[in-house]
């Protein structure tokens, strides 16, 4: 499942090709995604210009503005689900069975420098159809109140996210710290791979009740979360099965994993065999010697 690093890699890959371009045509082939695609999406997006691409948690937010006077800006919310990708294509090759939406993008008044002339295609592909493409006309100031965004925790790269924040928001929580990280209500984007890796770097056993973490351990964990996610973004995310970036390239962070998917193999620090357990129906990996 694409997590924060994969979504951020996608966002950064789209920026130089998509921002400033005009949506010349929209093709929706399958509307039955996680939530039905707006039946009027083609009309709503027609001739709008993509002004910005932001990210909130695992959602991509494309701000689409109209050149018509008085028409408010809108936001295309994209969630990649478990197997979704957004690809930039120089032309529109014949679609496959899982290619659900195309945006044909023509050069616009503010197209980024260095992009190729002529039209390009932004294609959404999702074999399992757990992704989502939604339209919202909420003003930017009210966008955090969108039903899909309002319960999300702080961004891990927000300066306010630190050990003090983590310590304060885990008080009274009896759930295991890995479970709390995956829930996303305290901090977003720490998916299954990155939770195991962050907890290893912080020296914290994933079954530790969140409310029992000391301030010092929260300091280490907050730093480990930021470092792990930053490294994953630098490596293009993790490709375990389906994920590719906007240019079709796979991610390579999985090659750097210290404990994830290494059950029975020696810990890279102490050589103790890595253990695998199940928490909330998700596999967890840890070193019983390095993590307490």
Swiss-Prot record:
Positions of the catalytic residues: 2 (schiff-base intermediate with dna), 3 (proton donor), 58 (proton donor), 282 (proton donor)
Cofactor: Zn(2+)
Pfam name, any one: Fapy_DNA_glyco
GO molecular function: 8-oxo-7,8-dihydroguanine DNA N-glycosylase activity; class I DNA-(apurinic or apyrimidinic site) endonuclease activity; damaged DNA binding; zinc ion binding
Gene3D superfamilies recorded: 1.10.8.50, MutM-like, N-terminal (3.20.190.10)
FPG-type zinc-finger residues: 258-292
Keywords: DNA damage, DNA repair, DNA-binding, Glycosidase, Hydrolase, Lyase, Metal-binding, Multifunctional enzyme, Zinc, Zinc-finger
Catalysed reactions listed for this entry: Hydrolysis of DNA containing ring-opened 7-methylguanine residues, releasing 2,6-diamino-4-hydroxy-5-(N-methyl)formamidopyrimidine; 2'-deoxyribonucleotide-(2'-deoxyribose 5'-phosphate)-2'-deoxyribonucleotide-DNA = a 3'-end 2'-deoxyribonucleotide-(2,3-dehydro-2,3-deoxyribose 5'-phosphate)-DNA + a 5'-end 5'-phospho-2'-deoxyribonucleoside-DNA + H(+)
Note describing how the cofactor binds: Binds 1 zinc ion per subunit.
Protein name listed in UniProt: Formamidopyrimidine-DNA glycosylase
Organism: Cupriavidus necator (strain ATCC 17699 / DSM 428 / KCTC 22496 / NCIMB 10442 / H16 / Stanier 337)
Higher taxonomy: Bacteria, Pseudomonadati, Pseudomonadota, Betaproteobacteria, Burkholderiales
The encoding gene: mutM
């Amino acid at each position: 499942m694409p997590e924060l690093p994969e979504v951020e890699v996608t966002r950064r890959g789209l920026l130089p090709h998509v921002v400033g371009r005009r949506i010349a045509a929209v093709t929706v082939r399958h509307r039955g995604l996680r939530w039905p695609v707006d039946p009027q999406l083609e009309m709503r997006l027609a001739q709008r210009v993509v002004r910005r691409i932001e990210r909130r948690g695992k959602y991509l937010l494309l701000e689409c503005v109209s050149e018509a006077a008085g028409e408010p800006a809108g936001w295309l919310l994209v969630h990649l689900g478990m197997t979704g990708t957004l690809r930039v294509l120089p032309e529109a090759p014949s679609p496959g069975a899982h290619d659900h939406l195309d945006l044909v993008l023509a050069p616009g008044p503010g197209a980024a420098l260095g992009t190729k002339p002529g039209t390009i295609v932004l294609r959404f592909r999702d074999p399992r159809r757990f992704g989502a493409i939604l339209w919202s006309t909420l003003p930017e100031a009210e966008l955090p109140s969108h039903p899909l965004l309002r319960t999300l925790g702080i961004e891990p790269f927000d300066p306010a996210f630190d050990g003090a924040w983590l310590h304060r928001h885990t008080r009274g929580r009896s759930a295991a710290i890995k479970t709390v990280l995956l829930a996303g209500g305290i901090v977003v984007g720490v998916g299954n791979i990155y939770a195991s890796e962050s907890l290893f770097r912080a020296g914290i056993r994933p079954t530790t009740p969140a409310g029992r973490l000391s301030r010092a351990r929260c300091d280490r964990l907050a730093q480990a979360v930021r470092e792990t996610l930053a490294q994953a973004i630098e490596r293009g995310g993790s490709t375990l099965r389906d994920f590719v970036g906007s240019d079709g390239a796979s991610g390579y962070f999985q090659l750097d994993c210290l404990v994830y998917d290494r059950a029975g193999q020696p810990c890279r620090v102490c050589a103790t065999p890595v253990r695998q357990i199940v928490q909330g129906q998700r596999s967890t990996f840890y070193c019983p010697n390095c993590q307490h």
